[in-house]
Amino acid sequence: MFTKQSLVTLLGGLSLAVAQTTTEGYPSLAEIRAAQATVQPYSPVSNVKGLTFNRFVNIWLENTDFDAAAATEHLPVLAKKGLLLNNFWAVTHPSEPNYCRHLPLGDTFGMDNDDFHQIPSNVSTIADLFDTKNIAWGEYQEGLPYPGYQGYRYPESGANDYVRNRNPLILFDSVTEDALRLRQIKNFSSFYDDLENHRLPQYMFITPNMTNDGHDTNITFSGDWTWGFLSELLENDYFTKDTLIMLTFDETGTYEIGNNIYTFLLGGAVPDDLLGTKDDTFYTHYSVIASLSTNWGLPSLGRWDCGANLFSWLAKKTGYVNYEVDTSNLYMNETHWGPLSDDDYSEYYAGWPVPTTDASCSAGNGILSTVKKTYEGLTATFNYTTPFPYDSRSGNNVGVKYSRTLKNGKVESGTSE
């Protein structure tokens, strides 16, 4: 077995997450075969009515500039069937911190790499938000050998089929230490079984393998795969009814430009008046967590999801006013400091960033109670109430102007500094 050790240490006085040593391993083929024969997927279902959609499907492709995706044969055709989010931004480089930031956590803790990580169990995730309303969730990872597989990749050699660093919730001990949660991380065979048997969850994250997502091929290949994957699903009423389907990318392929990524929404929950149009509202990966919280009345994690803009029609329905962001000086291509840094592209620092605990946040439902309890009395490390992440200490995304005009005519504005 191949082993790599990485120690995550904490600042002594603020040990709010348990330090531990993580082990990157490749189970033997015999161990994998045994697990395949015994570990069964877990497919909970729920029917919690949302404000504007009842199911959310998130599909990620890899490493492509906006213009390159827009020039493909199939992706613009699909986008015209729904709503193109013209101003949607990834939040850093490389890939793994975007996966971590977007779905489970709302932060990266300094992650500037695609390493093997295990994040302590008292760090809250989006799964904890869903649990407050008993909303069923699931991940579908193409090439995963069995539900809840925790190895770094599969197979160990050859083409990159499944890789751990594209599997957001497997990074968290609060998921891997829970047998039911772990079995909700499944493969594509389980996806089609769940589809056929009408037991899809209300939230799902879908990761193609490294060939189909374009990482080891190109955008033409991944665009063709997307067309083949989605075309049949879009004809399935069970899949599309009251469903919002997002197709997006983890990051741009060019690191020196702004991290604006090609993103569009499909499905029966896209408002009729928005079909075939473009939305120029400023969004980030964090906007997804914030919009899910708004849709289902969930609290915030108190991190960068707190101040993120909401999907425009959701904001209109709730009365929240999104910020306009001047992106002329915005790049979103660097990671803030933290304990998961390799000290290469961000600064390693042993202390874990403290979330905000007293903000109402854009979703309007306050902060998750366990987050408030864990960090009670501490001051937030960053200004998590802004519509994009920035850090004065490292100089990331500073000097960016943002503003909004409230319904009473009052103008609120600021500059990240």
UniProtKB/Swiss-Prot annotation:
Alphabetically ordered keywords of this record: Glycoprotein, Hydrolase, Secreted, Signal
One Gene Ontology biological process: phospholipid catabolic process
Secreted among keywords: yes
Residues carrying covalently attached carbohydrate according to the record: 122, 187, 209, 218, 333, 383
Secretion signal, residue range per the UniProt entry: 1-19
Catalytic activity, EC: 3.1.3.2
Active-site residue list: 216
Record GO cellular component, one term: extracellular region
GO MF, one example: acid phosphatase activity
Compartments it resides in: Secreted
Key word Transmembrane helix present: no
Reaction equations catalysed: a phosphate monoester + H2O = an alcohol + phosphate
Post-translational modification: The N-terminus is blocked.
Matches recorded under PANTHER family: NON-SPECIFIC PHOSPHOLIPASE C4-RELATED, PHOSPHATASE, PUTATIVE (AFU_ORTHOLOGUE AFUA_4G03660)-RELATED
Annotated protein name in UniProt: Acid phosphatase
Lineage, broadest ranks: Eukaryota, Fungi, Dikarya, Ascomycota, Pezizomycotina
